[in-house]
Amino acid sequence: MATENPQTWALWLILSEMASDMQEDKKVAKILVLGPPKAGKTTLCTFLADFMEDGDTLKKGEDSGERERKFEFEFTSVYRPTKGVRIQEFETHEFFTEQEQNELGGTRRLEDSEIQLWDVSGDKKYEDCWPAIKENAEGVILVVNPEEHKGSDLQQWFYEFVEKENIDLSCVMVILNEQGAKKTNHEQISGFEILPKLRGVHHVAHHFGSEAMQVKMEVNSFMASVLKMDQRQMGSGVDHGLGYADEQEDDF
């Protein structure tokens, strides 16, 4: 690979080395968080990291809505684009509730294992790094802002990171990320056009400022489907995920 940007070249080398290390460690579930700029990908990853750090219980004296309200800052502050990729790591036992862990019993990495969320920049100038970012990925979360983006804005991300990498649709999730101080985008949500090839994928529309716990539950369910897919690939023969519709369309 050749690139005129030395910073991009250095990032590519680092990511390639990380991907190589992951091949030796089969206990890492790598999930890519993708989408156009200003979709809220970093907000999602930061939000999940906060829950992992603090746990699902409220801090002493914390109002029940405090955690949800503080994420409004992410939408109203100055936009800071991600440079290349940010990686959040979680232990599986930290990510899932006790009930979810029981439901996932028997998967090969329930204990002493990691989930990695790769928060990938929406800037196409990092495209040279995509091969290293893709390597060993097992799931994809596509994020869009329905006020700013269209379904077609996900087309290249879906093609490059899902279709070309043969990611099963049960391991793909689309989040319509409603931004702003309050939830008011019902018209944009209802009018958002889903790509034909993504109609078999689980779509959710959420507003972090008022629906934080629902977002966490949806992402947990998605992560469980990725781990269950891993178990099926090891020969369990159980199908818990979503799939393509009976009639697929050849083109977007």
Curated annotation (Swiss-Prot):
GO terms for molecular function: GTP binding; GTPase activity. Keywords: Cell projection, Cilium, Cytoplasm, Cytoskeleton, GTP-binding, Nucleotide-binding. Gene3D superfamilies: P-loop containing nucleotide triphosphate hydrolases. One of its GO terms (cellular component) is endomembrane system. Belongs to the small GTPase superfamily. Rab family. It comes from Caenorhabditis elegans. Component of the IFT complex B composed of at least che-2, che-13, dyf-1, dyf-3, dyf-6, dyf-11, dyf-13, ift-20, ift-74, ift-81, ifta-2, osm-1, osm-5 and osm-6. InterPro entries: P-loop_NTPase (IPR027417). Component of the intraflagellar transport (IFT) complex B required for transport of proteins in the motile cilium. May be required for ciliary entrance and transport of specific ciliary cargo proteins such as che-3 which are related to motility. Regulates specific signaling activities in the cilia, such as the daf-2/insulin receptor-like transduction pathway. It comes from the Eukaryota. Disruption phenotype: Worms have an extended lifespan phenotype and are defective in dauer formation. GO terms for biological process: cilium assembly; dauer larval development; determination of adult lifespan; insulin-like growth factor receptor signaling pathway; intracellular protein transport; intraciliary transport; protein localization. This is Intraflagellar transport associated protein 2. Disulfide bonds: none annotated. Transmembrane segments: none annotated. Ciliated sensory neurons. Pfam families: Roc. It is found in: Cytoplasm, Cytoskeleton, Cilium axoneme. GTP binds at residues 35-42, 118-125.
